[in-house]
Amino acid sequence: MSSGGLLLLLGLLTLWEVLTPVSSKDRPKFCHLPPKPGPCRAAIPRFYYNPHSKQCEKFIYGGCHGNANSFKTPDECNYTCLGVSLPK
């Protein structure tokens, strides 16, 4: 294969890696945790990854004793657990 062909193949593989969403085996384990509002009484909107619907969903966080499946924005949740960003 010519060097141009190898360069093209390398470029395509790199593009594939960047554009391929996170597979379930590569997804951080905490993305499979259920939402945990915690016992405190604040009402902070947060987002968690729901492995059943395969999307990030809103929940209300109490402000303490939550878990790692709690994100401030849907974009942060989508990037971390799905490997994609929503269009702006």
From Swiss-Prot:
Source organism: Oxyuranus scutellatus scutellatus (Australian taipan)
One Gene Ontology MF term: potassium channel regulator activity
Protein name: Kunitz-type serine protease inhibitor taicotoxin
Compartment list: Secreted
Subunit-level organization: Heterotrimer composed of an alpha-neurotoxin-like peptide of 8 kDa (AC P0CJ35), a neurotoxic phospholipase of 16 kDa (AC Q7LZG2) and this serine protease inhibitor of 7 kDa at an approximate stoichiometry of 1:1:4; non-covalently linked.
Function recorded in the entry: Heterotrimer: blocks the voltage-dependent L-type calcium channels (Cav) from the heart, and the small conductance calcium-activated potassium channels (KCa) in the chromaffin cells and in the brain. Is very toxic to mice. Monomer: serine protease inhibitor that inhibits plasma kallikrein (Ki=0.057 nM), tissue kallikrein (Ki=0.23 nM), trypsin (Ki=0.31 nM), plasmin (Ki=6.1 nM), elastase (Ki=201 nM), factor Xa (Ki=871 nM), alpha-factor XIIa (Ki=2380 nM). Does not inhibit APC, urokinase-type plasminogen activator (uPA/PLAU), tissue plasminogen activator (tPA/PLAT), thrombin and factor VIIa. In addition, the monomer inhibits fibrinolysis in whole blood and prolonged the intrinsec clotting time.
Similarity comment: family membership: Belongs to the venom Kunitz-type family.
Annotated site, Reactive bond for trypsin, chain positions: R41, A42
Signal peptide location: 1-24
All residue ranges annotated as the BPTI/Kunitz inhibitor domain in the record: 31-81
Organs and tissues of expression: Expressed by the venom gland.
Intrachain S-S bonds: C31-C81, C40-C64, C56-C77
GO cellular component terms listed in the entry, alphabetical order: extracellular space
Prodomain residues: 87-88
Keyword tags: Blood coagulation cascade inhibiting toxin, Calcium channel impairing toxin, Calcium-activated potassium channel impairing toxin, Disulfide bond, Hemostasis impairing toxin, Ion channel impairing toxin, Neurotoxin, Potassium channel impairing toxin, Protease inhibitor, Secreted, Serine protease inhibitor, Signal, Toxin, Voltage-gated calcium channel impairing toxin
Domain of life: Eukaryota
Record-linked InterPro entries: Kunitz_BPTI, Kunitz_BPTI_sf, Prtase_inh_Kunz-CS, TFPI/VKTCI-like
